[in-house]
Amino acid sequence: MQNKINEKQQKILDFLNEQIEKNGYPPSVREICNAVGFKSTSTVHSYLEKLRKQGLIQKDPSKPRALKVINNKKNSKTDEPKNIYSGKELVEVPIIGKVTAGQPILAVENIEDTFPLPLDFVQNSTVFMLRVQGDSMIEAGIFDNDYIVVKQQSTANNGDIVVALIDDEATVKTFYKEKGFIRLQPANKFYDPIIVRDNLSILGKVIGVFRKM
C-alpha cells in the first residue's frame, strides 16, 4: 500500500500525467520545477526520489538519468497511451547551453535543461543536446534553432557530422581527415569549409535532430 503523498508530490504526479497524456513523454526536470513552483531543480530531484521510493515512478539505478513513469490511474484521464513514447523507459538528456575549452562538456554549470528521450534510442551512450545557431548545415537537414542529439566521443570517421571545438567556439560540420589537416565541411553551398591543422577537439558525433514545429 502506498504512503500518503503531500500536495507538492501530488502536483508533480498530476503534471507528469498531464504532460504524458499531451505529449506522450514526461516533462523535463526544469519544466517540473517551473510548473510546481520550486526554485531549484535539485528540489525536484529530491521529490522525484521520494516518489520513486513510494512506487509511483521508477528510476533505473544503473542509468542515473533514466526515468520510467508508472501509470497512475487515479490521476490519469485515460489508460491508453497517445503515442509510442508512453510507457517507454526514458533518459533525461542534458541540454548544453555553453561549450567551454578545458571544461567537461557535461559540467553542471553548462547544463541549461534536460529533455526526455527513449532509452532504446540513447542506449548505453553518453549523449547531450545542443541548440543549433546558423544555417551552415541546412543541406544535411539541420536548421537554425534545431536541437541536435550528440553522442559524446573524441574521435570521428570521415563523413561523420560532428560537434567540434575550435578556439573555444563550438561548430557543427561534417568531418574529413585530409593529408596534414582536418576539413570541416558545411552543408550549405554558400559557406566555405573550415581547414584546421591544430587546436581542434571533437566533442561528439551527431546522432539525431529535434525540431519544434
Curated annotation (Swiss-Prot):
InterPro entries: ArsR-like_HTH (IPR011991), LexA (IPR006200), LexA-like (IPR039418), LexA/Signal_pep-like_sf (IPR036286), LexA_DNA-bd_dom (IPR006199), LexA_repressor (IPR050077), Peptidase_S24_LexA (IPR006197), Peptidase_S24_S26A/B/C (IPR015927). The record marks A101, G102 as: Cleavage. GO terms for molecular function: DNA binding; serine-type endopeptidase activity. The keyword Transcription regulation applies. GO terms for biological process: DNA repair; DNA replication; negative regulation of DNA-templated transcription; proteolysis; SOS response. Its EC number is 3.4.21.88. The active site is at S136 (for autocatalytic cleavage activity), K173 (for autocatalytic cleavage activity). It catalyses: Hydrolysis of Ala-|-Gly bond in repressor LexA. Pfam families: LexA_DNA_bind (PF01726), Peptidase_S24 (PF00717). It is an enzyme of class 3 (hydrolase). Residues 29-49 bind DNA. SUPFAM superfamilies: LexA/Signal peptidase (SSF51306), Winged helix' DNA-binding domain (SSF46785). Keywords: Autocatalytic cleavage, DNA damage, DNA repair, DNA replication, DNA-binding, Hydrolase, Repressor, SOS response, Transcription, Transcription regulation. HAMAP family: LexA. Belongs to the peptidase S24 family. Homodimer. Represses a number of genes involved in the response to DNA damage (SOS response), including recA and lexA. In the presence of single-stranded DNA, RecA interacts with LexA causing an autocatalytic cleavage which disrupts the DNA-binding part of LexA, leading to derepression of the SOS regulon and eventually DNA repair. This is LexA repressor. It comes from Acetivibrio thermocellus (strain ATCC 27405 / DSM 1237 / JCM 9322 / NBRC 103400 / NCIMB 10682 / NRRL B-4536 / VPI 7372). The lineage of its organism: Bacteria, Bacillati, Bacillota, Clostridia, Eubacteriales.
